[in-house]
């Protein structure tokens, strides 16, 4: 099987039951198919925790105004986050590589509120957003940078946004995934591994699959033909869902105006 970051691709088999300790449930929310995977034991291909995937129309045709997708995405993400406290949004990836630029492009549209007011505004959650870059450009690993930021800011949670890989071509640019297990790339030993055990705070991950292996074991990858639009529109869509999840007292339209 090709490498995949999507939990439901590993455990959703139409003709067999999931492994012991794994529960898979699928539901419809309007025009969005939501699949929840809950892993209750260690020793499987993914860490124990909750994973939510949302199958949506082509991301390249959506944006921050598509409430039919943003509202269910925000609700699923909100359920994985602590109900209160500051949140640090980390845009993981290389902004100079299109397929890897989802994280940095997303944080550009996050509604940042931390440090904006001397006195906290009632109903507005403190949020900071950073795109730390890649170690080749900074000389520091993602773990070092994330750890330093967490120690300084002391957030209630770290929310990491990253490009994902899928094993199914039809899901590229058509799926959102959220999880409360941290950033756990499919490739073993990958440097982008962030979790609560390493950082001391809950780590929630969000992403969209933007590439897949050309074949199992190959170093070649396949990306959607409309990759530029997937990244641009996907970043806007994810940012809108994140903003709505973190600031439920504000409407999608209000958040769009505040981040425009």
Q: Where do the model's predicted regions map?
A:
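N-terminal amphipathic/basic leader segments beginning at the initiator methionine
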Residues: 1-49
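An N-terminal, well-structured beta->alpha segment
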Residues: 41-81
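Short glycine-rich or small-residue beta-strand-to-loop segments that form or flank ligand, phosphate
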Residues: 55-57, 86-97, 129-133
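A glycine- and small-aliphatic-rich helix-loop capping segment at beta-alpha/alpha-beta transitions
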Residues: 76, 98-115, 175-184
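Gly/Ser/Thr-rich loops at beta-strand to alpha-helix junctions
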Residues: 92-102, 136, 163-167
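Long, charge-dense
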Residues: 105-139
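Catalytic-core regions of hydrolytic enzymes
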Residues: 126-158, 163
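A structural signal for small-residue-enriched, beta-sheet-centric alpha/beta enzyme cores
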Residues: 130-131, 144, 160-260
């Amino acid at each position: 099987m090709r490498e995949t970051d999507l939990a439901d691709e590993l455990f959703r088999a139409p003709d067999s039951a999931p492994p012991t300790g794994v529960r898979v449930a699928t539901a419809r929310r309007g025009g969005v198919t939501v699949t929840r995977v809950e892993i209750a034991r260690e020793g499987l291909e993914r860490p124990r925790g909750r994973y939510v995937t949302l199958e949506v129309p082509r991301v390249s045709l959506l944006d921050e105004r598509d409430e039919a997708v943003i509202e269910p995405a925000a609700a699923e993400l909100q359920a994985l986050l602590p109900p209160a406290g500051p949140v640090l949004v980390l845009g993981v990836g290389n902004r100079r590589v299109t397929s890897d630029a989802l994280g940095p492009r997303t944080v550009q549209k996050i509604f940042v509120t931390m440090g904006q007011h001397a006195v906290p505004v009632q109903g507005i959650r403190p949020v900071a957003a950073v795109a730390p870059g890649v170690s080749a450009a900074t000389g520091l690993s993602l773990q070092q940078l994330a750890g330093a930021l967490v120690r300084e800011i002391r957030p209630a949670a770290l929310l990491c946004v990253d490009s994902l890989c899928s094993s199914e071509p039809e899901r590229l640019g058509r799926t959102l995934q959220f999880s409360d297990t941290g950033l756990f790339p499919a490739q073993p030993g990958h440097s982008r591994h962030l979790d609560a055990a390493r950082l001391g705070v809950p780590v929630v991950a969000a992403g969209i699959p933007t590439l897949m292996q050309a074949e199992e074991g190959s170093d070649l990858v396949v990306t959607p033909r409309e990759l530029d639009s997937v990244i641009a529109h996907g970043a806007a869509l994810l940012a809108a869902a994140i903003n709505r999840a973190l600031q439920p007292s504000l409407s999608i339209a209000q958040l769009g105006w505040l981040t425009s």
